[in-house]
Regions:
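Basic, helix-initiating cap at the start of DNA-binding domains
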Residues: 1-48, 59, 65
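Amphipathic alpha-helical linker/stalk segments
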Residues: 12, 30-34, 39-40, 68-96
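Alpha-helical DNA-contacting segments of helix-turn-helix folds
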Residues: 32, 60, 65-74, 124, ...
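Residues in the recognition helix of alpha-helical DNA-binding motifs
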Residues: 59-60, 185
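Amphipathic alpha-helical packing segments from all-alpha helical-bundle domains
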Residues: 95-109, 119-157, 163, 180-195
Length: 198
């Protein structure tokens, strides 16, 4: 009987530990959606997660370890959110992108502003840049014949600028455009670049 209970207790303990880690990461993530990294204390994260500062230090080392765990969460959430077939319409692809930006755009802009101060952000942001470029090239890259490699690269660069997180920030936050207006403007820019009528 004692042998049967031991695995149960170990698996229950492991599940509780995993649940605690998840609560801590999600608490830090919620705070990051609204605030700068340097403004958030481990005590705030601990209070939000229902644990102690010392437990966070034991599990994650310091704030950078916790930031790494949040980066893993952000990557995991972005994959399904951004997955659309390559052959969907410009509008459908941009609806997916803009929904993603609505979910995490402000946090990503804050991350970009803090990239030099927090080395833990660099891998995620570099991966994000690479994935955005690939996403743009796959969905909007020219099918026009006769473009040289240089012209194709320039076109992809223009399309990246049109769909970049900073373009969304300019339109949505700085100019106060609605989500629908941002979509309309981005669709028009992409279609014009591709030589299509909006």
């Amino acid at each position: 009987m004692a042998i049967a209970k031991r695995p149960y207790h170990q698996s229950a303990r492991a599940a509780a530990a995993e649940n605690l880690r998840k609560r801590i990461v999600e608490a830090f993530h919620r705070l990051l959606l609204k605030r700068w990294i340097d403004e958030i204390t481990l005590d705030e994260v601990a209070a939000s997660a229902g644990t102690t500062r010392q437990t966070i230090i034991r599990l994650f080392g310091a704030k950078d370890g916790l930031l790494d765990a949040v980066m893993d969460l952000v990557r995991a959430e972005a994959g399904p959110r951004m997955s659309t077939p390559a052959d969907v319409s410009v509008r459908a692809a941009l609806e997916t992108l803009i929904a993603h930006y609505e979910a995490v755009g402000d946090m990503v802009v804050r991350f970009l502003a803090q990239e030099e101060r927090h080395s833990a952000l660099r891998p995620l942001l570099a991966q994000g840049r690479d994935e955005h470029r690939a996403w743009v090239a796959e969905r909007f890259g020219s099918t026009q014949c006769g473009l040289s490699e240089l012209e194709r690269e320039r076109q992809i660069t223009r399309l990246i600028v049109a769909t970049d997180i900073y373009t969304r920030k300019l339109l949505r936050r700085d100019l106060g455009k609605s989500q629908d207006e941002v979509l309309h403007l981005m669709v028009a820019i992409i279609n014009k670049e591709k030589g299509e009528v909006t």
